Amino acid sequence: MEEQKSIKETLQQGASGDKTKKKLVIKKKAAPSDEKKESSPGAQGQTTATEAKQSSPASSDKKKDLNELIREEAKRQGLGSGPQAPSQASPIVSRPDRKPEPLPQPDREKAPMDRKPESILSGDTSSPNFRSGGGQGGGNQGYFRKEDRNPIVSRPTTPRPPRPEGQTGGGYQGNRGPGQGGGYQGNRGPGQGGPGGYQGNRGPGQGGPGGYQGNRGPGQGGPGGYQGNRGPGQGGPGGYQGNRGPGQGGPGGYQGNRGARPIGQGGPGSGRPPGDAPFGAPGGLPGAGGPGGAKKRVFDKEKGGREENENTKFFKQSFRKQKAQAAALAAVPKEISILENIQVGEIAKKLNLKPGEVISKLMKMGMMVTINNVIDAETASILADDYGCKVKIVSLYDETVIEEEKDAPEDYITRPPVVTIMGHVDHGKTKLLDTIRSSRVAEGESGGITQHIGAYQVETERGKIAFLDTPGHEAFTSMRARGASVTDIVVLVVAADDGVMPQTIEAINHAKEAEVPIIVAVNKIDLPAANPEKVRQELSNYGLQPEEWGGTTIFCDISAKSNIGIDKLLEMLIIQAELLDHKANPKRKAKGTIVEAKLDPGRGAVATVLIQNGTLRVGDAFVAGVHAGRVRAMYDDLGRSIKEAGPSFPALVTGLDGVPDAGAPFDVVIDDKEARTISHSRQEYERLGQSKNAATRVTLDNMSEIIKQGALKELKVIIKADVRGSTEAVKEALEKLSTADVRLNVIHAGTGAIVDSDIILASASNAIVIGFHTRANPKTVSLAEKEKVEIKYYSIIYDVVNEVKASMEGMLEPEKVENIIGKVEIRDVFKISKVGNIAGCMVKSGKVTKQAHVRVISSETGEITWEGKIKNLKRMKDDVADVLTGFECGILLDGFNDFSVGDEIEAYEIREIARKL
């Protein structure tokens, strides 16, 4: 009865609005099947230490009666109707628009509970459901099973009245103004409000249970917050993963270090503003300070965070590096195109790699390089293969391809054939062309030998034919190869009296490589020694079977000198061209090939261009090899000025900024700007390909080779010729003369007249200057005499090769040849003091001279025991120069006395013979 009276007084005090008294304790009746009692969240958070002591020793029946009395008394007095009365027995209010939904009941066997309600109410911290830490009051709400928590009470069916200002319920993830309700993830303003906010800060006041993951301001509030800081107060159980401020509260928090409780009472009292709080629970008095240790926990957390960040940073950097490497490898193309030589920076760009990575790779391969060094194609292939990339070696012009135009099919017309005349030297190629043109071309050639390619267009009864006349000398291999590459038909001229020769075979190979048909012209059939059948037999061994023998090759017996069979040859050419049916579009920009180029004293750089497609006109901008220009004037093969040149027309073009290489492509472009851009790119690639600083592997073998090469004898020359093709031919012929003992080094090769710069270069490098079909002016000749530079002029390539060869042979060390001149037998040995042993000899064969070299051969072993010179030779008592066969003589050797009777002395001479290349 005393307990009932105490409770009654408590309820009356709460109804009268006394804020400083103890909180109302409301217990919910447990289900009959439950073995344990559970208090509501509000009651747990607001149970004082005195009430916990009063309720802990009571029996189960007594508690049941007490709870019923509390509920009946609360209903009778109508709590919540007054301005200061608490709103509900439970902080979770019912809602009128929804039916109550009971919480699911978990299986008790799966979640056993070894504590008793008494231990909760009494603040027993020895229970395994609590962590260590001081304080009394309610336990940690996060540790209770769902079935032990206060279930949601039924909600009234009547409509819910609007909330007045100051009484608003808790918001969700927002800021909560001053009032009573519990907010969720928001800041809770000061007031008496209901349950604690979730993940938000709770302002000072007397409110309900603690917030979740938020800070709780000072006050007397309910249970501790979750993952947040709790302000000073008397509140309930400790927070979860957060720091608990000073207060009297319940058991310690979770996952936090809880230090010793500070001395003294809790923080300030309630800061509740005036007004109704129907949804809030009454606040309590400030209690003793809560557990400390927050700073230590934060320090440990921050320290661990720093260590984790350092490790994470290391692994992230490694991961990023591996990812970058994988991305770099993925960016490497499957195939790249390069020239014979390529810069390190350029190949790195083609491989989509950083130059530093490529340099590092090359250094591992034993090559000391920088970004500007040049490596050869072989090294580049090995480097690219390590990255899974294939290398394709291309020419200079493949690297700078000019975009092709699209031709309309209706614009195509049949173009005249391009015929190249090939064969061995002096087999009558130029004479044949002379007969066809009815001109005197052959007489204009030096020595009757063609020195460069001639391009002509001939008008016949059956149509036009473009002819290219190539040199037959072995030095002009490159010219013949170019002629075969731009031609449609090859006419192979073979002399009937001479048969197949080396250049004949070479011409056959060039034509087969170019995949062009061959028509054989058997020339000089009017000579008595002519044997056309022998020529057919020899050519059949090289795959050229005559049609009359069942083959596919056309043979024409002709005589260029007597004009025999020429018409038949032209007819065969036209028939073959009709079968090939080559087309071209005269409406497009011109495209062709440089047949020949030279530096003309009056017109500058000029080039013979064979137009293969399109039409070339005066004023067109073009790119010729590595040079650019604009057509200033054009001339035909007879020297007449023309305005345009169509397909299969050879034209002489002026307006180039340099002398292009023979065989270089000729392309008309849009304007001068594009021409210069392409020209500069090609010149850069050309310099790169000719670079002398190509990196090499650093090995002892290379060093030995360099040392050996330094001892080589070397002849240095500078070559100047009238046309580029002749320059190439002379250079190629001379470079073939190099041997292991003497080497020919072409310092410079160019076209045009010999100028002062050539003389200065020759003087500095100790070279001779060779002029082929070109000369030096008087001023340059005077400079050469002053600098003591030799200039040689030639018009026939035979003379160039023979004289240079003789000069190189003179640089060779002569070959020493041993010649035995006599043999002498030793028949006696005379010992003379102060002189030595003298051999008494008989000359058995030849003769022995005082100047001869001799060797002593032992009669016992047959081995040579000594070699040297004769010091003195005597016949009787007289000194003699030589002794012939059958005569006796005395021989004193220079420095040798250990010979015996029966030994043989062999006399020989050493002659020096000039070596040949």
From Swiss-Prot:
InterPro entries membership: EF-G-like_DII (IPR053905), IF2_II (IPR044145), IF2_N (IPR006847), P-loop_NTPase (IPR027417), Small_GTP-bd (IPR005225), T_Tr_GTP-bd_dom (IPR000795), TF_IF2_bacterial-like (IPR000178), TIF_IF2 (IPR015760)
PANTHER family: TR-TYPE G DOMAIN-CONTAINING PROTEIN, TRANSLATION INITIATION FACTOR IF-2-RELATED
Amino acid composition bias (Basic and acidic residues), ranges on this chain: 60-76, 95-118, 297-312
Residue ranges of the region described as G2: 448-452
Name of the protein in its database record: Translation initiation factor IF-2
Pfam families per record: EF-G_D2, GTP_EFTU, IF-2, IF2_N
Entry-linked CDD domains: IF2_eIF5B, IF2_mtIF2_II, mtIF2_IVc
Annotated segments matching region G4: 523-526
Subcellular location, record wording: Cytoplasm
Keywords of this entry: Cytoplasm, GTP-binding, Initiation factor, Nucleotide-binding, Protein biosynthesis
Positions that bind GTP: 423-430, 469-473, 523-526
Domain tr-type G: 414-587
Annotated organism of origin: Leptospira biflexa serovar Patoc (strain Patoc 1 / ATCC 23582 / Paris)
SUPFAM superfamilies (UniProt xref): Initiation factor IF2/eIF5b, domain 3, P-loop containing nucleoside triphosphate hydrolases, Translation proteins
Polar residues bias: start-end ranges: 41-59
Compositionally biased spans, kind Basic residues: 20-30
Region G5, annotated ranges: 559-561
Family annotation (PROSITE patterns): G_TR_2 (PS51722), IF2 (PS01176)
Annotated stretches, region: G3: 469-472
